[in-house]
């Protein structure tokens, strides 16, 4: 059974390059989501975030594991910024497809905040999924085409997210 996830965490090139390598990832595509402009493009995406749509096998990588990796590879504590990229297009967001994903997202954020792994509080938006406008072909799998291209995403070494104690 395939599940869908939609995430935003800065420039979509680096997010796609790392997430597509996880076990059970069936496909990824980058695009624009979370805003109001119809038929969004790179030159005209209004208030959309650069996002990634992920189709995955939850038997190989659970939604929780996917979110833990998401929080490991980008800084969720900086509003509208990742690395040198600034502006609302680069915000951190989780776009849930159902109430179960919403609850997992909120629980994971609470665990990240309680862990102290990041120096500040998580500012990641949690919103229902809306339209996802696929980005232009040159943006798809960009870092496979340009292996030394720009990215500000990387797995933090020894980054393991503990779950909060039941009393928290």
Curated annotation (Swiss-Prot):
It is an enzyme of class 1 (oxidoreductase). Pfam families: PMSR. Keywords: Oxidoreductase. The active site is at residue 11. Disulfide bonds: none annotated. This is Peptide methionine sulfoxide reductase MsrA 2. GO terms for biological process: cellular response to oxidative stress; protein modification process. Has an important function as a repair enzyme for proteins that have been inactivated by oxidation. Catalyzes the reversible oxidation-reduction of methionine sulfoxide in proteins to methionine. It comes from Rhodopirellula baltica (strain DSM 10527 / NCIMB 13988 / SH1). GO terms for cellular component: cytoplasm. The keyword Nucleotide-binding does not apply. Its EC number is 1.8.4.11. It catalyses: L-methionyl-[protein] + [thioredoxin]-disulfide + H2O = L-methionyl-(S)-S-oxide-[protein] + [thioredoxin]-dithiol; [thioredoxin]-disulfide + L-methionine + H2O = L-methionine (S)-S-oxide + [thioredoxin]-dithiol. GO terms for molecular function: L-methionine-(S)-S-oxide reductase activity; peptide-methionine (S)-S-oxide reductase activity. InterPro entries: Met_Sox_Rdtase_MsrA_dom (IPR002569), Met_Sox_Rdtase_MsrA_sf (IPR036509).
């Amino acid at each position: 059974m395939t599940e869908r996830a939609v995430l935003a965490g800065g420039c979509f090139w680096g997010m796609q390059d790392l997430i597509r390598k996880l076990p059970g990832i069936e496909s990824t595509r980058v695009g624009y989501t979370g805003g109001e402009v119809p038929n969004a493009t790179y030159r005209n995406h209004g208030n959309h975030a650069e996002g990634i749509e992920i189709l995955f096998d939850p038997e190989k990588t659970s939604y929780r594991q996917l979110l833990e990796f998401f929080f490991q590879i980008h800084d969720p504590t900086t509003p509208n910024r990742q690395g040198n990229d600034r502006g609302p297009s680069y915000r951190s967001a989780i776009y849930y497809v159902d109430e179960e994903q919403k609850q997992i997202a909120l629980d994971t954020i609470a665990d990240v905040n309680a862990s102290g792994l990041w120096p500040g509080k998580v500012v990641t938006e949690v919103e229902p999924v809306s339209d996802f406008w696929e980005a232009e072909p040159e943006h798809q799998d960009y870092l496979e085409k340009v292996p030394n291209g720009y990215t500000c995403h990387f797995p933090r070494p020894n980054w393991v997210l503990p779950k909060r104690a039941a009393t928290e």
